[in-house]
């Protein structure tokens, strides 16, 4: 667990240049056969807006706020949780004019202590794909603690066919995780998995390529 957390902290808060604040990651739009702006709009309309509007939202690993800007613009209150001090500081500056945001620096597995049974929606995209199984399991326990009864979590994660034989060869590569494992972690902590799929817009077949989205309720 510690090595995965340490490696991700080094990569995303020190080594990575964030050339377009996360918008440089366009390959999932390419694989969906649509423009990046269409892909991004589809994700917001299917995975964020139905759950974040007028809600208390917690985002895990916002990075430079690629999705946070949409969440903050429609939610009642947003809590941004990140492992990287520089990423959190960037978000503080970027969203300084918004009064409905607070920030929490995690050590890599925990959510704010005060966020117990008060969160309507937990969202994370492009972060759990890099987390090891033990880190995800720890976060799942925290998500269960943070969500209100009836609350929802949407997690984007890796979908590796055979995690047991998979070898991560560099930091930032997909971790040895699949939907079955994520389902098990969620159910272990009393959460219900409602849907797991690589596609969120069935009509246009827009999704996250070789990864998966898990929708969870409490």
Predicted regions mapped to residue ranges:
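Class I (Rossmann-like) S-adenosyl-L-methionine-dependent methyltransferase catalytic domain
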Residues: 1-54, 60-115, 131-138, 142, ...
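Short catalytic micro-motifs in class I SAM-dependent methyltransferases
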Residues: 126-127
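A conserved beta-strand element that flanks and buttresses the S-adenosyl-L-methionine
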Residues: 123
């Amino acid at each position: 667990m510690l090595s995965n957390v340490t490696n991700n902290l080094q990569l995303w808060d020190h080594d990575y240049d964030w050339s377009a604040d996360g918008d440089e990651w366009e390959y999932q739009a390419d694989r969906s056969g649509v423009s990046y702006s269409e892909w991004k709009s589809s994700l917001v309309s299917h995975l964020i807006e139905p759950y974040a509007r007028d809600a208390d939202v917690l985002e895990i690993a916002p990075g430079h706020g690629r999705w946070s800007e949409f969440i903050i613009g429609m939610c009642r209150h947003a809590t941004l949780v990140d492992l990287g001090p520089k990423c959190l500081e960037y978000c503080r500056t970027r969203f300084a004019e918004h009064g409905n945001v607070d920030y929490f620096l995690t050590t890599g597995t925990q959510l704010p202590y005060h966020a117990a049974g008060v969160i309507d929606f937990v969202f994370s995209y492009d972060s759990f794909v890099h987390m090891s199984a033990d880190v995800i399991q720890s976060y799942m326990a925290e998500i269960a603690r943070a969500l209100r009864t009836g609350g929802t979590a949407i997690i984007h994660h890796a979908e590796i066919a055979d995690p047991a034989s998979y070898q991560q060869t560099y930091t930032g590569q997909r971790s040895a995780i699949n939907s079955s494992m994520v389902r098990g972690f969620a159910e272990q902590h009393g959460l219900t998995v409602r849907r797991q799929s690589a596609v969120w817009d069935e009509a246009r077949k827009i999704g996250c390529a070789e990864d998966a989205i898990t929708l969870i309720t409490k």
